[in-house]
Design a protein with these regions (language model features):
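Flexible hinge/capping segments at coil-to-helix
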Residues: 99-142
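Beta-alpha-beta core module
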Residues: 99-107, 112, 175-232
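Alpha-to-beta junction loops
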Residues: 75-88, 114, 181-191
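Central regulatory/effector-binding core of bacterial HTH transcription factors
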Residues: 30-95
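Alpha-helical "hinge/linker" immediately C-terminal to small N-terminal DNA-binding modules
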Residues: 1-24
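Short beta-strand-to-loop elements that line the ligand-binding cleft
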Residues: 58-67, 144, 163-176
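Immediate post-signal peptide segment of exported/extracytoplasmic ligand-binding proteins
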Residues: 19, 23-33, 136-139
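Secondary-structure junction motif
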Residues: 44-46, 92, 126-163, 233-237, ...
Length: 249
């Protein structure tokens, strides 16, 4: 009996996998888009606008959110058509080398100043200047994604002279990160995105946060996108990239 159950379970697993492949093949023939990123406000807004534009004729948009290395995995495995990530300039060459090794073709989008985002509970929120020094930040706790707490990018705080051996808050989602910013004195190491561009005439999702540029910083925040070398861009993927490029223009 145990042998029979094991045999049937194996067959069932194969049938489920086959069904998944069939459905995936069907989805590829729909008006669809799959995009992976590290979780960006501008990308969610752009995809939402795209969805509203085409929803009357039927559209499927799938957004993946993960850290930089896993975004590359998603594109390489064809789970996502395109990937959009931020890479600190000090790590960029090594990251691009990894992309090339996986036959992923990259394109530069923008080079931004490094900044920090704070909520109303942070003493920096009410300052007059739009800049903050590393020395000031060393007195405050950071909130960060788990891949910034350990791993190949964890020394960015040392490189920026922000090392704080005290408390820190580690999260795995964007929603949790901004909840922490709202309720603590933590700061988030960010990029100087042009937040106001997408918020013109619309309620701002960032009205209760403030982003300050890091003074005297020679490291930059590089925004890039990539795809598989053999992937032919679809109408929707082209529209997304064109919109992202215009956002940073």
């Amino acid at each position: 009996g145990h042998t029979f159950v094991s045999y049937v379970s194996s067959i069932q697993a194969q049938l489920v996998q086959l069904d998944s492949l069939i459905r995936r093949d069907f989805v590829q023939h729909e008006f669809s888009l799959s995009v992976a990123s590290s979780g960006y406000y501008f990308l969610s807004r752009i995809c939402a606008e795209l969805f509203e534009r085409y929803r009357s004729i039927g559209i499927r948009i799938e957004q993946f959110e993960d850290h930089e290395n896993n975004v590359a995995d998603l594109v390489d495995s064809q789970a996502a058509e395109i990937g959009i990530v931020r890479v600190w300039s000090c790590y960029k060459n090594a990251y691009l080398k990894q992309l090339r090794a996986r036959k992923l073709q990259h394109f530069d989008i923008a080079s931004l100043s490094i900044a920090v985002t704070v909520g109303e509970q942070n003493p920096l929120y009410h300052r007059e200047s739009d800049f903050v020094s590393a020395a000031e930040l060393r007195e405050l706790p950071p909130v960060m994604y788990s891949n910034m707490d350990s791993g190949p990018y964890a020394d960015i705080y040392d490189r920026l002279h922000l090392s704080n051996k005290g408390s820190r808050f580690v999260v795995s989602s964007r929603s949790a990160l901004y909840e922490i910013l709202s309720n603590t004195s933590c700061y988030y190491l960010n990029s100087a995105y042009p937040f106001d561009v997408l918020d013109t005439g619309l309620p701002s999702n960032y009205a209760n946060y403030r982003t300050l540029k890091l003074a005297n910083c020679d490291i930059t925040s590089e925004i890039i996108w990539f795809k598989r070398e053999d992937y032919i861009m679809s109408q929707l993927s082209n529209e997304v990239i064109n919109s992202v490029t215009r956002y940073f223009a």
